[in-house]
């Protein structure tokens, strides 16, 4: 029986290693799942809880499993999402806009959520990407510890490098729980960030048209 348990643990650890994020500092070894669960127990004790009481006995394992999902963006790169493009764009010469892409991310300062919507547009030159891929790209970066500014920049850069379009426009609107549920306690405040490249950056009229389409379609 002990041999079976040992084998199961080894398999579990192997599976955990397979999930190792690809974007980690090379000098930062990843703690084991058991070590991560122990850290959760420490935090439970720190806030004044008894991590051994019945209702919390499975909490460390649940928290770490949820982290595998919430922070799953570390295990992917933009190339995994934008690996397939299409060249059949015909005579289309305007920009493609996806608006109101919902997302939830976590603030890197307090590890509490911020959530909102991303609006993404690009001017294709020779190739386009599937619409779902843009939403997946937003999720990829949102499922990491973030600042809203960095999230905006990462989405913009990834599309710019993968598609080589005439321009990219990204706007994000979000509410940050670090303002709503702690600190200044101001729920309902919306933070807006934007970044433009190419035609969107160089031609203010295109920026106006981008924003007009966002507001006009609500």
UniProtKB/Swiss-Prot annotation:
GO terms for cellular component: cytoplasm. The gene is folE. This is GTP cyclohydrolase 1. Keywords: GTP-binding, Hydrolase, Metal-binding, Nucleotide-binding, One-carbon metabolism, Zinc. Belongs to the GTP cyclohydrolase I family. One of its GO terms (molecular function) is zinc ion binding. Gene3D superfamilies: 1.10.286.10, 3.30.1130.10. HAMAP family: FolE. Pfam families: GTP_cyclohydroI.
